Structures are given as structure tokens and as C-alpha cells.
């Protein structure tokens, strides 16, 4: 079968000498996000410098994970990324992979050997939150997790990413080799800390001396990653094939925007990703707060008020100038003042970029999807900034309307009288309140949900007054009119 390797393509394949690449990074979890993000940054570095940092890709799960590794090997580890902008799509053939491994093909031993090679300097991960096998309540490693139990009983034939890392570090220590850096690239807050807790938890359960060696010799930098990469569908793959002239089963589509902020804390060298747009910083937390409040906060605002206003996607809300203006004002006038950013951070440029991303019609990010699980998202995205304004006397009318929009949305009926499919772990509580209360009484009852509003906000007369007024306006005038009046 013809592949992207042996076809005439409308886009250039990597032109550098592939033999110069060394597998200096072993990456666990070769999913769509990694292929559109870290592997792409590494590709651009190879393209523009004489870097030799290549990636040894590892997938651990059976099924699709194995099929992807096999498909990559059939096309010399090349694959396509389609960056879909509002006006046009740019295709790139990515060539940063040096090897691709899977336990069913290469055995556990093959993967552990790759991780224990002298040149392996970084082991990176995109294994999703559940891949860290943490106990939800304590945040510590869950020793009852079936994968972790297996890895404690069979340490040299692990199944979890954490098990592979601990055993590979044991092998390096035994051989007298320098440790590697463990770099999480998952979209999890303080992801380096999450990875460290998991690795040390398993090492401690296996051998306290090994845990002490890891604590002393391994670093776990935090990273903040941002790029919208929808899961590949048959339609996406066909669309890319039509543009490419050949079918690529490993292709993925994403938005043009990408961001990567990395804590500069490596034990064994690192690529100069900052030469191709990444940022190395001393502390990632301010950037996580920036993303949480400016991006996620305005996303929630647009999701509730957009859905109520009859808009299906975030891009649809951006066709209304009042919504565009409100989202930008929320970011710059109400969220930006709550942040403590390093000198030289241009929040105005960031907000402008976010509006551009929100306006991209090819992404089809549904307002209903972003509105899910509001009880879990509201505190960090909208309520914490409100608390800072209440302390410092700032203006927060957009935040008040955002909170009121969430309250109106949880009524479960839209402005046309149609049912809203509210998806939230606290849905039963909302339904109970909806059956008993309306108007200002309903606001008061919702504010009594201490899991969301804690004890301080319901006691604050300014907060209660502003949110109640915004809610009553929404019920009387509708979302579009209220957003236009901001």
C-alpha cells in the first residue's frame, strides 16, 4: 500500500539526515496530543538547528495503542499534522521520531532497555490523569490500583507508566548511569508534582533506598501545555487524505495555536525548545493561573451565556460583537488584574490570541460540552477571582454575569422553554432546588451549596446582591441582551 513515504506529496517531507537523530527522549503515551505538541516542537527544532534530540515513542496499552505503533513503523515513523486555521489548513510531515516500541512487539525488556540506555536523558509522559494511578482523595499513589499491584508483584515486567519509570531508574542506578528527567506533559495542574508523588510512592513501596536515590537524582519539572487537538475521526482522516493525496492512518488535526511553558529543571540536558516557541521559566504556576482564569474562565462565561443565547459553538458566540467584546473585557479588566505574572508577560497579546482561537470555526467546540461539570469548574475559574476583587475593591460585573449564567443554565430549561441536558455531579441538588425555589430564593438556595461557594461568599452582601441582580436580569431580558448591556 502507498504511504506518505513513497508518494508525491503537496508538502515537503523532513529534509535533514534522519541518521543524526539519537533516541535521547523516551516518550510514554504516543497519543494525538503528543504528536501535535511535543513531537512537533522537537521536529521544528531539528528542522532549524543541528539538534540530535530524537524521540523513542512507547505505547503501553493493547488495541489501538499497538496499531498506531505498527502504522508508524510502516511509514518510517513519519506522520501528518493538519493545523486548521479559520481560513486555511497547513499540512506538516513530522519527523522527530527515531523509534516506536510496544510491549506486545518489543517486550517489557525492550522498552526498559531503551529507558536505561546511557543517551536517554528525558522520559516524558502523556498518559492522562488516570495514568498516574493516584488516589483521588489523598493525591498519593493508589497501592490498590490493579496496575500498581501488578507492578509491585512483577517489578521487572511492569504494566503502568509509573512502573516502567521506577524499574528503568533502578536499572540505571545499578549500572552507575546518570538518572533521567521525568517530564509530564499532561494537562494536569502542577503535573511534575503529580508525577513525582507517583514515582516516589511506588519506589518507596519497592525499596526505600531506591526512593531516596530517585529523590536525590531525578527532577520532575512542571509544564503547562496548550493546544486544542480533537480526537481523530474517520472524517478528519479522510479530509487530510483528500488534501494529501494519500491516506495517513496516523494523521491528526489541531488548531494553529500552540503553547508550552516548561520549568527549567533538568538533570541530564534538554533540547533548546525555546528556539522554536516554548518558554523555559523558573515557576510554571503563574502561567497555569493565567490559562485557568483567562482561557478557561472566559470559556465558561461564553459556554453558559452562549448556550442560553442560542449558540451551539464557541466560534458561533464570537460572531456576535457583544460576546467578543465581553469575553475580552472579562479577560483584561477582571481576570488579568488577579494574576501575578513574571515581568515582560504581555497579557493583552495573550487575550487577543485567545479571542482569535475562540473565533476559529473549524474547531466546533460546543458550548454544551464546556458547560459540563460547572460545579467543579466554577470555584477556580470565576469565584476565586471574585474573592480577590471583593478584597481589593475591583470591578467584576462580567464575573457576576458569568456566575448568574451558570445559575440560569442549571435550571435545565433554555430561553425557548426547551430542556437543557445538564451534566454535573451535583445535578440532583440542582433539581431539588429547582423544584422548590425560584427568583431570588433560588439564587439563595444555590449559594447554600458550600461545595461550590464555601462559607464566605454567601455571607458577603455585595456578592449576593450582584449575583442576584444579574440572575434576575437574565431571567427577564435573556442572555444576548444582558451581554450587550455589559
Q: What are these regions, as identified by a protein language model?
A:
Residues 1-486:
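Substrate/ligand-engaging "lid" and interaction regions
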Amino acid at each position: 500500500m502507498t504511504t506518505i513515504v513513497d508518494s508525491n506529496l503537496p508538502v515537503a517531507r523532513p529534509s535533514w539526515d534522519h541518521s543524526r537523530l539519537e533516541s535521547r527522549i523516551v516518550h510514554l503515551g504516543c497519543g494525538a496530543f503528543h504528536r501535535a505538541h511535543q513531537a512537533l516542537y522537537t521536529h521544528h527544532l531539528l528542522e532549524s538547528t543541528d539538534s540530535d534530540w530524537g524521540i523513542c515513542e512507547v505505547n503501553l496499552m493493547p488495541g489501538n495503542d499497538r496499531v498506531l505503533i505498527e502504522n508508524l513503523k510502516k511509514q518510517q515513523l513519519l506522520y501528518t499534522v493538519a493545523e486548521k486555521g479559520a481560513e486555511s489548513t497547513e499540512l506538516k510531515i513530522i519527523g522527530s521520531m527515531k523509534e516506536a516500541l510496544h510491549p506486545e512487539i518489543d517486550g517489557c525488556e525492550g522498552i526498559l532497555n531503551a529507558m536505561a540506555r546511557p543517551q536517554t536523558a528525558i522520559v516524558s509522559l502523556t498518559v492522562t490523569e488516570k495514568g498516574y494511578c493516584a488516589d483521588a482523595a489523598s493525591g498519593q499513589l493508589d497501592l490498590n490500583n490493579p496496575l500498581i499491584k501488578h507492578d509491585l508483584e512483577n517489578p521487572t515486567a511492569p504494566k503502568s507508566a509509573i512502573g516502567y519509570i521506577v524499574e528503568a531508574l533502578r536499572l540505571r542506578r545499578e549500572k552507575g548511569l546518570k538518572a533521567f528527567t521525568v517530564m509530564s506533559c499532561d494537562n494536569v495542574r502542577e503535573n511534575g508534582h503529580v508525577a513525582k508523588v507517583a514515582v516516589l510512592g511506588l519506589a518507596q513501596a519497592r525499596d526505600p533506598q531506591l526512593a531516596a536515590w530517585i529523590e536525590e537524582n531525578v527532577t520532575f519539572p512542571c509544564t503547562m501545555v496548550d493546544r486544542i487537538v480533537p480526537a481523530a475521526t474517520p472524517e478528519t482522516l479522510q479530509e487530510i487524505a483528500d488534501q494529501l493525496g494519500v491516506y495517513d492512518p496516523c494523521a491528526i488535526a489541531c488548531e494553529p495555536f500552540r503553547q508550552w511553558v516548561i520549568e527549567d529543571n533538568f538533570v541530564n540536558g534538554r533540547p533548546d525548545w525555546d528556539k522554536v516557541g516554548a518558554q523555559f521559566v523558573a515557576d510554571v504556576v503563574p502561567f497555569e493561573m493565567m490559562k485557568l482564569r483567562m482561557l478557561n474562565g472566559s470559556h465558561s462565561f461564553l459556554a453558559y451565556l452562549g448556550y442560553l443565547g442560542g449558540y451551539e459553538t464557541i466560534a458561533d458566540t464570537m460572531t456576535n460583537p457583544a460576546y467578543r467584546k465581553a469575553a475580552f473585557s472579562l479577560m483584561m479588566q477582571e481576570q488579568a488584574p488577579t494574576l501575578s505574572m513574571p515581568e515582560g508577560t504581555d497579557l493583552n497579546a495573550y487575550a487577543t490570541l485567545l479571542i482569535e482561537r475562540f473565533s476559529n470555526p473549524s474547531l466546533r467546540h460546543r458550548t454544551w460540552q464546556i458547560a459540563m461539570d460547572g460545579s467543579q469548574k466554577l470555584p477556580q475559574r470565576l469565584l476565586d477571582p471574585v474573592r480577590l476583587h471583593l478584597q481589593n475593591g475591583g470591578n467584576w460585573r462580567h464575573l457576576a454575569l458569568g456566575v448568574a449564567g451558570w445559575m440560569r443554565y442549571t435550571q435545565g430549561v433554555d430561553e425557548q422553554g426547551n430542556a437543557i441536558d445538564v451534566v454535573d455531579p451535583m445535578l440532583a441538588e440542582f433539581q431539588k432546588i429547582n423544584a422548590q425555589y425560584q427568583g431570588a430564593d433560588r439564587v439563595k438556595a444555590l449559594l447554600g451549596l458550600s461545595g461550590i461557594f464555601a462559607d464566605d461568599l454567601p455571607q458577603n452582601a455585595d456578592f449576593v446582591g450582584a449575583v442576584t441582580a444579574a440572575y434576575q436580569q437574565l431571567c427577564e431580558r435573556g442572555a444576548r441582551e444582558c451581554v450587550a448591556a455589559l
